[in-house]
């Protein structure tokens, strides 16, 4: 798909002219469009907040934004709001960037599964998923997928920071 121009209001606020330029800026610097609202959202009471735009998730500020804007946590990383995440779906595209991908799996899971009944193994895997996702989310990774005994996470510079590779190693 050829690169497309962004609407003029986004060109002015993001200081880029095309969708691919926006994606590059987003993936390297973070979701800059919503950062313009950080000051306003920061004045609303209540933590926890979206680490990107500072929208509150709880308390009176969170309730107010849920009612007015439908704000909720992202499915890919609950430290970010769905608005920051869904903004990108309005402008499909991408950019070639350096990022870190982490695969976490259960060593010997087949052998373990053979020694347990199905429900015990299912509970074990659910505990693995919960613990792993909790650590990865705290490191600002985006959970890409859960497959069998594996969790795949993306450490994107615009969200995990310039030290994304180090953060992935420390989280893993």
Language model features by range: what are they?
Residues 1-98, 111:
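Regulatory cytosolic signal-relay segments
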Residues 92-170:
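Catalytic NTP-binding/metal-coordinating core of nucleotidyl cyclase/transferase enzymes
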């Amino acid at each position: 798909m050829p690169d497309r121009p962004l609407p003029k209001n986004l060109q002015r606020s993001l200081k880029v002219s095309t969708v691919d330029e926006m994606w590059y800026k987003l993936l390297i610097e973070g979701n800059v469009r919503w950062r313009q609202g950080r000051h306003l959202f920061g004045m609303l009471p209540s933590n926890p907040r979206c680490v990107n735009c500072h929208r509150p998730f709880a308390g009176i500020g969170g309730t107010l934004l849920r009612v007015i804007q439908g704000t909720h946590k992202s499915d890919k990383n609950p430290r970010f709001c769905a608005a920051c995440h869904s903004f990108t779906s309005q402008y499909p595209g991408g950019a070639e960037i350096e990022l870190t991908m982490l695969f976490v799996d259960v060593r010997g899971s087949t052998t373990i599964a053979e020694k347990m009944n199905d429900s015990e193994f299912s509970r074990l895997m659910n505990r693995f998923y919960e613990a792993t996702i909790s650590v990865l989310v705290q490191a600002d990774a985006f959970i890409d997928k859960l497959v069998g005994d594996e969790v795949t996470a993306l450490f994107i510079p615009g969200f995990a920071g310039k030290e994304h590779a180090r953060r992935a190693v420390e989280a893993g």
